[in-house]
């Protein structure tokens, strides 16, 4: 009953979390224990502290800090185990129905849509990255960073559009497509990823770049802008908030917490890779074509585009293991400078039909941008630069012209 008593005390003491956790525990019985743990986290921190949690936020001394971190780890482990059981059962049932064909790897030929591009490599300090370029080498650098589960081709509409004025470079991040794939999980930490961006810009002969990013590429771009602001001429992030704003949202919003289920699932070993690869990489089709979360304009994601994705995840030693390792580092990442104001001109483009991220985190991001602008694209999905390329390109053009 002590557990119940603490839970009730938390309900009374932390009213701003009441609606969130009551909804969690009452309407979603499977998450009752998660609701309890969330309230333990609330109990260990002052009402008006900033998020994410830090030593400076905690009003009750080091014991409260360590208790909070201990309970947080329990929460992550519980969710990790819950999704391990859930998706292991799904894979078992799938295997019972389809047998070995569920995990059969198909031989694929390179799709025509990947032909005719200027494909290059750059050797960095630790890895060799692949990139595709449009525009000439003597123009200002516009660097494109893709998200998950993507590769350079997700910027195909932008590579063509901006080639007349810029040297457009779309990289395959480490672990993707034709780039190197280090084996260890630690090789995919945020510090390693931001180091790659620094090395790419310098390796191409520049001291700064216009950085355009989406999803996980955006997380890398935000962190890069914090660590190396002098190397970011302008920053454009598509459907990705600042990490500090995202953490605020996931701690205080059941909507975002629920949408982020896969982050906990990806903490497991092997099962996520097996699920993503199963049934001829059905997961990719769901990501980009499902009504709720996929690209809304079907003409912008053809059957051949889908085949290009499957090709990139099946050739050259590619595996879902390496991109998923990004997520396996996410709970160990150092705390971002949530209150650091970024000085460079920054544009956030947001598709309002994003099934993975709440727009409120993007709006909150503007509070820490000195020259921040946000443009909403109504009805566009999380994959906004592919869903509405004409509108995205127009917003980027106006933004670049404004800050010439």
From Swiss-Prot:
What positions does the domain AB hydrolase-1 occupy?
A: 140-389
Q: What happens when the gene is disrupted?
A: RNAi knockdown of both ceeh-1 and ceeh-2 results in the accumulation of 9,10-EpOME and 12,13-EpOME.
What's its membrane topology?
Single-pass membrane protein
| Main subcellular location of this protein, as a coarse class | membrane
- Pathway it belongs to? Lipid metabolism
Cysteine pairs forming cystine bridges in this chain are none
Catalytic function, reaction form: an epoxide + H2O = an ethanediol; 8,9-epoxy-(5Z,11Z,14Z)-eicosatrienoate + H2O = 8,9-dihydroxy-(5Z,11Z,14Z)-eicosatrienoate; 11,12-epoxy-(5Z,8Z,14Z)-eicosatrienoate + H2O = 11,12-dihydroxy-(5Z,8Z,14Z)-eicosatrienoate; 14,15-epoxy-(5Z,8Z,11Z)-eicosatrienoate + H2O = 14,15-dihydroxy-(5Z,8Z,11Z)-eicosatrienoate
Q: What keywords would UniProt list here? A: Hydrolase, Lipid metabolism, Membrane, Transmembrane, Transmembrane helix
Instruction: Please identify the protein, giving its name as recorded.
Output: Epoxide hydrolase 1
Q: What is the lineage of its organism?
A: Eukaryota, Metazoa, Ecdysozoa, Nematoda, Chromadorea
């Amino acid at each position: 009953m002590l557990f119940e008593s603490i839970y009730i005390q938390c309900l009374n003491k932390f009213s701003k979390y009441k609606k969130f956790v009551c909804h969690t525990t009452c309407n979603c019985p499977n998450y009752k224990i998660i609701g309890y743990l969330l309230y333990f986290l609330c109990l260990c921190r002052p009402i008006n502290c900033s998020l994410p949690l830090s030593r400076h936020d905690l009003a009750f001394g080091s014991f409260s800090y360590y208790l909070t971190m201990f309970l947080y780890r329990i929460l992550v482990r519980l969710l990790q185990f819950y999704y391990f059981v859930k998706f292991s059962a799904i894979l078992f049932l799938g295997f019972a129905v389809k047998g070995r064909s569920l995990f059969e790897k198909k031989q694929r030929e390179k799709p025509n849509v990947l032909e005719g591009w200027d494909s290059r490599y750059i050797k960095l300090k630790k890895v060799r990255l692949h990139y595709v370029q449009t525009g000439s080498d003597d123009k200002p650098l516009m660097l494109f960073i893709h998200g998950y589960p993507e590769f350079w081709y997700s910027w195909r509409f932008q590579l063509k559009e901006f080639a007349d004025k810029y040297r457009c470079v779309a990289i395959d991040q480490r672990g993707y497509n034709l780039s190197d794939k280090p084996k260890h999980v630690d090789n995919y930490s945020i510090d390693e990823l931001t180091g790659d961006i620094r090395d790419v810009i310098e390796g191409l002969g520049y001291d700064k770049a216009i950085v355009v990013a989406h999803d996980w590429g955006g997380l890398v771009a935000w962190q890069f802008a914090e660590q190396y602001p002098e190397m970011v001429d302008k920053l454009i992030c598509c459907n990705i908030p600042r990490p500090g704003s995202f953490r605020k949202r996931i701690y205080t919003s059941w909507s975002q917490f629920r949408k982020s289920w896969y982050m906990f699932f990806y903490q497991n070993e092997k099962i996520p890779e097996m699920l993503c690869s199963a049934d001829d990489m059905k997961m990719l089709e769901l990501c980009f074509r499902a009504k709720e979360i996929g690209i809304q304009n079907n003409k912008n994601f053809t059957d051949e585009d889908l085949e290009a994705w499957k090709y990139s995840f099946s050739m050259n030693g590619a595996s879902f293991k390496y991109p998923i390792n990004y997520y396996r580092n996410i709970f160990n990442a150092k705390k971002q400078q949530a209150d650091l104001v970024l000085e460079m001109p920054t544009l956030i483009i947001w598709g309002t039909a994003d099934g993975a991220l709440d727009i409120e985190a993007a709006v909150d991001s503007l509070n820490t941008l000195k020259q921040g602008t946000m443009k909403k694209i109504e009805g566009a999905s999380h994959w906004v630069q592919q869903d509405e390329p004409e509108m995205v390109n127009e917003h980027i053009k106006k933004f670049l012209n404004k800050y010439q």
